[in-house]
């Protein structure tokens, strides 16, 4: 019995020491602030998973800030944000990057094959943006958008001019746009919205992009991780992980759907990281 007590005491002491070292390690590391685009499902999922890895695997304290796209870029440039994983280039955020490229670093690619444009349900009998005026009445002359000032909204304004559309672009938010889309889908009514991939709505409904013969919205894009130049010095280990972090349609889709189904972003991210240790290990090597 005495031997058992001694062994138990040693085990408890070792566990306490390990916990103390872990706490000390976290205390010695700087707090990191990541920004993400408020209302963008992919941005929410990607940033929360990255934050979970930084916290649970690398021992950093992480603060998350939901912001608009323009503020995200400005925040990284000023150092208010250490990094953001939602830099869509070359089209969507091209204007922001052109203005701030001397003050930020693109440190990694976290998603390839991204795309923006105008989206309709598959039951809608319109194929091209150029054909929208012919169906103005069906759409009530309206394009349902997201946040005013977002890159996709700027491109949509350009598309309205380029195609001489007699349509109004209605600003709302990412969640409000999907609510309007859900309502239209339920009633099988025509609707055209600003949209992008990756997004959980493509897993939920049969949707397609309208053809864009003038290429106003550009070709497929890449989502980059953008960081303040000081991150490498401030937190080299974190910078290394963020450079390596990249995931697939299936991976990001699983987290986005979990959130859409009612899970909190933090819990969805935590569960995904716990269920995919080998993938996480790849990012940390």
Question: Residue ranges of each PLM-predicted region?
Answer:
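Bacterial N-terminal signal peptides that target proteins for export
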Residues: 2-13
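Immediate post-signal peptide segment of exported/extracytoplasmic ligand-binding proteins
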Residues: 24-34, 133-140, 278-285
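Extracytoplasmic "Venus flytrap"
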Residues: 29-48, 69
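Short helix-initiation/N-cap motifs at beta->coil->alpha
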Residues: 40-41, 63-75, 169-180
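Ligand-binding cleft/hinge of the Venus flytrap
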Residues: 50-59, 134-169, 274
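A ligand-binding cleft/hinge motif common to bilobed small-molecule-binding domains
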Residues: 85-100, 183-208
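A conserved helix-loop-strand patch within extracytoplasmic ligand-binding domains
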Residues: 102-149
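A bilobed periplasmic-binding-protein/Venus flytrap-type ligand-binding module shared by bacterial periplasmic
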Residues: 115-125, 221-234
